[in-house]
UniProtKB/Swiss-Prot annotation:
It is found in: Nucleus, Nucleoplasm; Nucleus, PML body. Residues 137-187 form a coiled coil. InterPro entries: THAP1/10 (IPR026516), THAP_Znf (IPR006612), THAP_Znf_sf (IPR038441). GO terms for molecular function: DNA-binding transcription repressor activity, RNA polymerase II-specific; protein homodimerization activity; RNA polymerase II cis-regulatory region sequence-specific DNA binding; sequence-specific DNA binding; zinc ion binding. The gene is Thap1. DNA-binding transcription regulator that regulates endothelial cell proliferation and G1/S cell-cycle progression. Specifically binds the 5'-[AT]NTNN[GT]GGCA[AGT]-3' core DNA sequence and acts by modulating expression of pRB-E2F cell-cycle target genes, including RRM1. Component of a THAP1/THAP3-HCFC1-OGT complex that is required for the regulation of the transcriptional activity of RRM1. May also have pro-apoptotic activity by potentiating both serum-withdrawal and TNF-induced apoptosis. A motif (HCFC1-binding motif (HBM)) lies at residues 131-134. This is THAP domain-containing protein 1. Highest levels in heart, liver and kidney. Lower levels in brain and lung. GO terms for biological process: DNA-templated transcription; endothelial cell proliferation; regulation of DNA-templated transcription; regulation of mitotic cell cycle.
Length: 210
């Protein structure tokens, strides 16, 4: 017969590969056996010679150290249990079933005119509704502001491009003016000295009387 734990809710069974030992009720010591029965707290439970409790319900000081936690001390009593009373569990389940689940306020129909009326705004529902509106309004305002900023950036970019083009045109005009001034100065100098500047294929400058 496979040994199993008699504690309520414990599913431990003997397995040679698991470090769990099983200890029979001390039937030959009635006073100690009653302590075990009281600790188990099972209604109408009477231990037999096959009844046992696994080592998981005993504290470490209940075992003899020299026996590698396989033998109990003479007055050891199990104290580690997770009690769940059946009737309490049933009552909890029944109370949970009886509690109505919260539901949002339903729309009402006015019998006199047959129109669907909006749901009654309770304080909680109204608070959530207002918070939602604030969030939507903030988001719309932010999107509108972003669009305005993007439009401003685009306008500034166009203005910058136009200014750069105007600057380049002015630089070209300035270069042309410099060339004209330089040419005019050379022309004036040649006129004052009575020289005529000939093309490059001439190798000398011919002086003419003024």
């Amino acid at each position: 017969m496979v040994q199993s734990c008699s504690a309520y809710g414990c599913k431990n069974r003997y397995d040679k590969d698991k470090p769990v030992s099983f200890h029979k009720f001390p039937l030959t010591r009635p006073s100690l056996c009653k302590q075990w029965e009281a600790a188990v707290k099972r209604k109408n439970f009477k231990p037999t010679k096959y009844s046992s409790i696994c080592s998981e319900h005993f504290t470490p000081d209940c075992f003899k150290r020299e026996c590698n936690n396989k033998l109990l001390k003479e007055n050891a009593v199990p104290t580690i249990f997770l009690y769940i009373e059946p009737h309490e569990k049933k009552e909890d389940l029944e109370s949970q079933e009886q509690l109505p689940s919260p539901s949002p306020p339903a729309s009402q129909v006015d019998a006199a005119i047959g129109l669907l009326m909006p749901p009654l705004q309770t304080p909680d529902n109204l608070s959530v509704f207002c918070d939602h509106n604030y969030t939507v309004e903030d988001t719309m305002h932010q999107r509108k502001r972003i669009l305005q900023l993007e439009q401003q950036v685009e306008k500034l970019r166009k203005k910058l491009k136009t200014a750069q083009q105007r600057c380049r045109r002015q630089e070209r005009q300035l270069e042309k003016l410099k060339e004209v001034v330089h040419f005019q100065r050379e022309k004036d100098d040649a006129s004052e000295r009575g020289y005529v500047i000939l093309p490059n294929d001439y190798f000398e400058i011919v002086e003419v009387p003024a």
